[in-house]
Amino acid sequence: MGKYRTYPFFHDRSNVFQYNKEKNEYETIAYEKNNQILAASIDTLGTLWIAGPNGITRIYLPSNRKEPLKLPDGNDVITSLVIDHEGIVWMGSLGIIYAYNPQKNHFVIYNEMDGVLPNDFLAKPVLVASDGNIYMGGSEGLVRINKALKSASIPPPITLELQEVSLNGT
């Protein structure tokens, strides 16, 4: 699921572990007793992102502070999670992909109108490629998010065209 400092992190259905090479042992970092872990990832700043049936939780490992993340559309179920090279958290749900920028506290939602076909995204088939593209797989296929294409934050200008001119009724 990722690395923080020099430690690789792993998860099962209720625990997140870090592997300590020096001690040759796994240490439990987070335990989700009442919330099954569907997907998890860790960023370079030490924020652990855990997706479960009751929503997203982020744990700041340096301070051990834990807080929920509310999705803008009220959805609670995230089944796929990956963090790109820029720190954007990509989350897959039923037919929707969320891109969350934690620095700006800003969401972008991608759905069928953006080319994301209905898909039940899965936790394991996720990849951030060396070129920055994001790949998220599900039961209905694979989605590639081309990071070279930037979404327009400013809508294109409206252009008006004259269709007909009438002078004194003619």
Sequence positions of predicted segments:
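Conserved beta-propeller blade signature
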Residues: Y7-F10, T47-I50, I88-M91, N133-M136
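Residue-level "micro-hotspots" composed of small/polar
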Residues: I29-L38, N54, E67-V82, G92-T170
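Surface-exposed loop/turn elements that mediate protein-protein interactions on large endomembrane-trafficking
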Residues: F17-Y19
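Short, compositionally biased segments
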Residues: K3, H11-R13
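Residue-level detector of Asp-centered blade-edge/turn motifs that repeat once per structural unit
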Residues: M1-R5, I42-L45, I83-E86, V128-D131
